[in-house]
Amino acid sequence: MHTPTRQDDLTTWLHYLGNIHVSAIDMGLERVLPVFRALALAKPAFVFTVAGTNGKGSTTATIASICQQAGYKVALYQSPHLISFNERIKIDGIEVDDHTLIEAFWQVEQIRQACGVSLSFFEFMTLAAFYCFAQQHCAVWVLEIGLGGRLDVVNIIDPDVAVITNVAIDHTDWLGATREQIAKEKAGIIRGDIPVIYGEFDMPISISQQLQSLQAKYYCYCLLYTSDAADERSSV
């Protein structure tokens, strides 16, 4: 397949990226690691990584907005998009333009070919997003996990805060058939000695065990609000 150039448009690049790997989903970090390392991207000052069955999009958007209002230059990575691919990659709330994306795609593709590895569409897109964020010197990165957590390409970067919104039965072909199995995959974003936030009260045992084994700095439950918020809220 012909490799697009910097002069090709975004549609051409997206078609190419959708056809260079044998499967749309291919869990694991082994193929991605050499490309990521060769990119040699500077680590941002602060990284939020958000996993969970539901609510990842609204959670990442809220975190990004708060950080931006606080005066930081904020990178936001989400998926999937609704209308335009560019929605997935934002800096200070503004979608990255086609030219910036194409340059990122071209840079990642040169390194991918040099490393001799194949990347899925999501893996390639994620590395391109990281390249955009690093080139724009974003201080805070807010990253949404695509699928699961432990083996998701987003998890290649160590977070400073890990957020798991909730855990429900979903994507059982990839994450496991039970809530505990799925939770164990999502718990893969947890690192030792960082804040971990879990967004529902019935925490799966596998997440609790991961917190204990890694001695995560602390964790808390999010506040729950109903129509009777004043009576229903529960503190950390």
Model-derived regions, located:
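Conserved small/polar residues in nucleotide/adenosyl-binding loops
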Residues: 225-232
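ATP-dependent carboxylate-amine ligase catalytic core
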Residues: 25, 29, 33-43, 69-157, ...
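Conserved catalytic-core segment of NTP-binding enzymes
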Residues: 149-151, 158-210, 214
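Conserved adenylation A10 loop of the ANL superfamily
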Residues: 50-57, 165, 226
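Aromatic/hydrophobic pocket-lining residues that form π-stacking "cages" and hydrophobic walls in ligand
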Residues: 63, 129, 207, 211, ...
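Short glycine/serine/threonine-rich phosphate/pyrophosphate-binding segments
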Residues: 58-62, 149-151
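Short functional linear segments
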Residues: 1-52, 59, 65-70, 77, ...
